[in-house]
Design a protein with these regions (language model features):
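Alpha-helical transmembrane segments and their helix-start/interface "positive-inside/aromatic belt" motifs
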Residues: 1-15, 47-48
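Membrane-helix interface motif
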Residues: 19-36
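Alpha-helical transmembrane segments and their membrane-interface exit regions
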Residues: 118-129
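Membrane-water interface of transmembrane alpha-helices
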Residues: 59-73
């Protein structure tokens, strides 16, 4: 693994930690005086921002770990397309988090729907491996 790749992996992991810190700060400061007699005026917007930040954090955190796992599995060699596969997996993980959060806000999240979303992400990755990563 080259120095540039190690630096990119570290930068992605640190940016994910930064986004998580931003998420925690926003969630703790968004509506500090939410009470039954005085509800938060921007509660829906705050929830959407929190879900977006969570999806971004998950996506940024999955990419370096997907790349590192491929590096270990393939015998400590990064083949062509490794970054593309890692980015695709990060996008799928972030989209799954965003979709589950959106379903939760809409009140449509149930256990079967959540299982379907996770299985759908797995099926998309399986089809992408067969279609794009075939030798």
């Amino acid at each position: 693994m080259s120095r540039r790749t190690r630096l990119a992996v570290a930068a992605l992991a640190l940016s994910a930690i930064l986004v998580v810190g931003l998420l925690v700060a926003f969630a703790s400061l968004a509506c500090p005086s939410d009470a039954p007699e005085q509800p938060c005026p921007g509660a829906v917007t705050n929830r959407i921002v929190v879900i977006g930040l969570a999806a971004l954090a998950v996506g940024l955190l999955v990419v370096p770990f997907a790349l590192l796992s491929e590096f270990v599995i393939r015998g400590r060699i990064l083949y062509r397309g490794a970054w593309g596969r890692a980015i695709r997996r990060g996008l799928l993980a972030g989209a799954s988090v965003a979709l589950l959060g959106g379903l939760r806000i809409g009140g449509a999240l149930t256990v079967p729907v959540a299982i379907f979303v996770v299985l759908l992400a797995g099926a998309i990755e399986w089809l992408a491996i067969r279609r794009f990563d075939a030798p």
